[in-house]
């Protein structure tokens, strides 16, 4: 046998051995008492709160929670790299079709409710806007704060990135006013930021900025605006009670997605999320529990 053939056989043997080791590792990892939860940046603090409490009660379990956006979480579920996707929007038809092609059956679980707060700096005199005014501002048709009762100052638009469920929801429900044929887009000059916290930090330091995110991120460094459906409607502040009673016009459900009906540790974790203890964590993180 030539030296070249011996080297080829050695390479093939090593390749087979490597594949066996990878398969064995994957099988062993699957049997571990751990799950990966990924997705909505709005929900990441909530998800970590659930995970920490669950692991405190179940020391042998490991729940890893990361953000990245609703689209990122759903893509990970579809590709099989996470067990639970967190999403602040419904899964899209094209995502379901792609999942089905890959043998994934997305199962939707409503885990809480959220109000989208529209925030400005506390130094900004504007305290209320209509949904229509918001649409005009974020699409770039209203450019100066003086047009809505504020200072003579150019508006600085802050938005989440396009893979964010918060971005998608705001565009569909505020810019396009729930019109399935709507074509309105965010103004080209809008700054697309990677997280809700990034928007919160920017608003806190910029008196001309306006942004939006889940109301759980609001602090004393930002001022949430009261929002009205139209000029004839009451202006409503983004509070838990106003989301729960349906008065606040920019509210939405928060979802978990699993591959088929939850099983094993995934089911135990989801059951915990939906329990009174899990829903108390929803309330403690300034979201609205589904069973309140």
Regions found by a protein language model. Name each.
Residues 2-13:
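Positively charged n-region of N-terminal signal peptides that target proteins for export
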Residues 19-27:
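Hydrophobic h-region of N-terminal signal peptides that target proteins for export
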Residues 27-292:
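Exported/periplasmic ABC-transporter solute-binding proteins
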Residues 14-15, 21, 277:
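Transmembrane alpha-helix boundary/anchor motif
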Residues 18-19, 48:
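Extended rod-forming repeat segments used as scaffolds/tethers
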Residues 11, 15, 155-156:
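Alpha-helical transmembrane segments of integral membrane proteins
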């Amino acid at each position: 046998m030539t030296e070249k053939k011996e080297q080829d056989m050695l390479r093939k043997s090593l390749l087979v051995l490597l594949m066996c080791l990878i398969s064995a590792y994957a099988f062993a990892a699957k049997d571990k008492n751990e799950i990966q939860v990924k997705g909505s940046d709005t929900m990441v603090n909530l998800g970590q709160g659930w995970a920490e409490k669950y692991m405190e009660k179940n020391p042998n379990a490991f729940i890893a929670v990361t953000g990245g956006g609703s689209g990122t979480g759903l893509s990970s579920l579809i590709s099989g790299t996470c067990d639970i996707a967190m999403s602040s929007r419904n899964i899209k038809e094209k995502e379901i079709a792609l999942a089905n092609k890959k043998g994934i059956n997305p199962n939707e679980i409503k885990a809480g409710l959220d109000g989208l707060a529209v925030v400005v700096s506390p130094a900004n005199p504007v305290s209320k806007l209509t949904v229509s005014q918001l649409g005009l501002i974020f699409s770039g048709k209203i450019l100066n704060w003086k047009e809505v009762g504020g200072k003579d100052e150019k508006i600085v638009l802050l938005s989440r990135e396009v893979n964010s469920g918060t971005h998608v929801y705001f565009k569909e429900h505020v810019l396009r006013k729930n019109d399935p044929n709507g074509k309105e887009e965010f103004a080209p000059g809008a700054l697309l930021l990677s997280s809700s916290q990034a928007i919160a930090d920017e608003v806190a330091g910029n008196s001309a900025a306006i942004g939006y995110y889940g109301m759980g991120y609001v602090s004393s460094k930002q001022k949430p605006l009261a929002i009205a459906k139209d000029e004839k409607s009451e202006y409503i502040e983004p509070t838990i009670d106003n989301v729960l009673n349906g008065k606040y016009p920019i509210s939405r459900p928060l979802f978990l997605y699993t591959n088929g009906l939850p099983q094993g540790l995934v089911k135990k974790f989801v059951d915990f999320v939906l329990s009174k203890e899990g829903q108390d964590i929803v309330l403690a993180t300034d979201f609205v529990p589904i069973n309140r």
